[in-house]
């Protein structure tokens, strides 16, 4: 894969996607959107944990990826900027870091 990437880079500039958080904000997700069914009774507010949307709203996350691809992005990044135990601890979700990261990768691949 790396060799193919270098080959393409020799002939043209590749475009990366843009800010994921900015796109998420445009959707106006509510606390209920972030929680989904799975985290409905979670004891901490989850709004703002954008990485969790790969689990609770994968269709919307995929749609954001598709919009970037339609706009001309050659490379998209996963929605997992804060999908690590330290950042997710703010939401009591540190034990879900691996699952959220895997979900984010799966959603990006599906786009």
Predicted regions located by residue number:
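Domain-level signal for soluble alpha/beta catalytic cores
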Residues: 1-111
């Amino acid at each position: 894969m790396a060799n193919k990437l270098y080959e393409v880079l020799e002939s043209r500039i590749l475009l990366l996607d843009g800010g994921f958080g900015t796109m998420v904000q445009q959707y106006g997700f509510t606390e209920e959107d972030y929680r989904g069914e799975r985290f409905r009774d979670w004891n901490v507010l989850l709004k703002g944990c954008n990485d969790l949307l790969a689990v609770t709203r994968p269709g919307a996350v995929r749609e954001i990826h598709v919009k970037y691809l339609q706009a001309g992005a050659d490379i998209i990044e996963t929605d997992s900027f804060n999908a690590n135990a330290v950042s997710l601890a703010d939401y009591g979700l540190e034990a879900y870091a691996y699952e959220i990261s895997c979900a984010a990768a799966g959603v990006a691949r599906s786009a």
